């Protein structure tokens, strides 16, 4: 299941979303995340879902490809849904059997919060799938440039965030390899009680940490060999270009925001 993790991966395709400036995509996603947290009824969530499908169509990515990326975090979504179903009270009583008491408000809140998670994950995943890691680093650095006046290491922060994001699928792949190696030696991580499964995961941690530190060391050596010395005197082979279609795409947030605020009230 871990090998299906797609967050942090880049899929080079020819599409409108791929051509957009990464700074525009980051600002768009940030504002959309704020709007998603403002959603409070089915109409506003419907707007968010329709928007996701439009963006998917414009990025030439299939819905099933994106949906498969949810499987590694499916447990978190189910856990969130169940927590609200059993703990949130209000509305009509749907089930009342012994200690189990499920009310309509809990079901509604559970579905809405789960939808909120899914929309945010879809948006951020589409951004990483359609943005080159180097361009993503440059975009973060460009957006954080005003903080240079506060003597903050903007370039280093941007590089750190980009590397961390890029290492997510790498570490997931490494975890998958270690799990298969352990299972080939007779270890069964899918059977037994919850306590036994947790114990079975512990042998994964040591080789995974060793591999992560080894990859980090190799990356540091490779950067040093290529003469990387931070932002000082660094030039860029490719520069970010803001086009008219980036401005127009960003302006679509105005009617989207107004519509969500109208439906919210």
Swiss-Prot record:
GO terms for MF: transmembrane transporter activity
InterPro entries in the record: ABC/ECF_trnsptr_transmembrane, EcfT
Topological relation to the membrane, as annotated: Multi-pass membrane protein
Residues passing through the membrane, by range: 26-46, 47-67, 72-92, 107-127, 152-172, 243-263
One GO CC term on file: plasma membrane
UniProtKB keywords: Cell membrane, Membrane, Transmembrane, Transmembrane helix, Transport
Domain of life: Bacteria
Record keyword Transport present: yes
Subcellular location(s) per record: Cell membrane
Cytoplasm keyword on record: no
Protein purpose: Transmembrane (T) component of an energy-coupling factor (ECF) ABC-transporter complex. Unlike classic ABC transporters this ECF transporter provides the energy necessary to transport a number of different substrates.
Similarity section: Belongs to the energy-coupling factor EcfT family.
Subunit composition and interactions: Forms a stable energy-coupling factor (ECF) transporter complex composed of 2 membrane-embedded substrate-binding proteins (S component), 2 ATP-binding proteins (A component) and 2 transmembrane proteins (T component). May be able to interact with more than 1 S component at a time.
Protein name in UniProt: Energy-coupling factor transporter transmembrane protein EcfT
Species annotation: Macrococcus caseolyticus (strain JCSC5402) (Macrococcoides caseolyticum)
Taxonomic lineage of the native organism: Bacteria, Bacillati, Bacillota, Bacilli, Bacillales
